[in-house]
Amino acid sequence: MARSIKKGPYVEESLLRKADFEGGAGSKKVIKTWSRRSTIIPEFVGYTFAVHNGKKFIPVFVTENMVGHKLGEFAPTRTYYGHGADKKGKR
């Protein structure tokens, strides 16, 4: 269910502090985060976040099209290897 408009988007406070501290958008510094639930706000455009997917950190460069989405949407947690292999080859 969507979040109420009167509440505004959820962004982890530590993420906001790190983004302000890192020295501006477009800097080479990657901001490491476990907060997949944080909403991408316009101030994050140009930053690169390393979003944890449960196993490793996936680099996500934020563009204008991503505003309003969650950080976790761009770091998939499941890998799909396809369905079972062809059984004819096993005989």
Swiss-Prot record:
<dbReference type="GO" id="GO:0005737">
    <property type="term" value="C:cytoplasm"/>
</dbReference>
<dbReference type="GO" id="GO:0006412">
    <property type="term" value="P:translation"/>
</dbReference>
<dbReference type="InterPro" id="IPR002222">
    <property type="entry name" value="Ribosomal_uS19"/>
</dbReference>
<dbReference type="GO" id="GO:0019843">
    <property type="term" value="F:rRNA binding"/>
</dbReference>
<protein>
    <recommendedName>
        <fullName>Small ribosomal subunit protein uS19</fullName>
    </recommendedName>
</protein>
<comment type="similarity">
    <text>Belongs to the universal ribosomal protein uS19 family.</text>
</comment>
<dbReference type="GO" id="GO:0015935">
    <property type="term" value="C:small ribosomal subunit"/>
</dbReference>
<keyword id="KW-0687">Ribonucleoprotein</keyword>
<keyword id="KW-0694">RNA-binding</keyword>
<keyword id="KW-0689">Ribosomal protein</keyword>
<comment type="function">
    <text>Protein S19 forms a complex with S13 that binds strongly to the 16S ribosomal RNA.</text>
</comment>
<dbReference type="InterPro" id="IPR005732">
    <property type="entry name" value="Ribosomal_uS19_bac-type"/>
</dbReference>
<dbReference type="InterPro" id="IPR023575">
    <property type="entry name" value="Ribosomal_uS19_SF"/>
</dbReference>
<dbReference type="GO" id="GO:0000028">
    <property type="term" value="P:ribosomal small subunit assembly"/>
</dbReference>
<keyword id="KW-0699">rRNA-binding</keyword>
<dbReference type="InterPro" id="IPR020934">
    <property type="entry name" value="Ribosomal_uS19_CS"/>
</dbReference>
<dbReference type="Pfam" id="PF00203">
    <property type="entry name" value="Ribosomal_S19"/>
</dbReference>
<dbReference type="GO" id="GO:0003735">
    <property type="term" value="F:structural constituent of ribosome"/>
</dbReference>
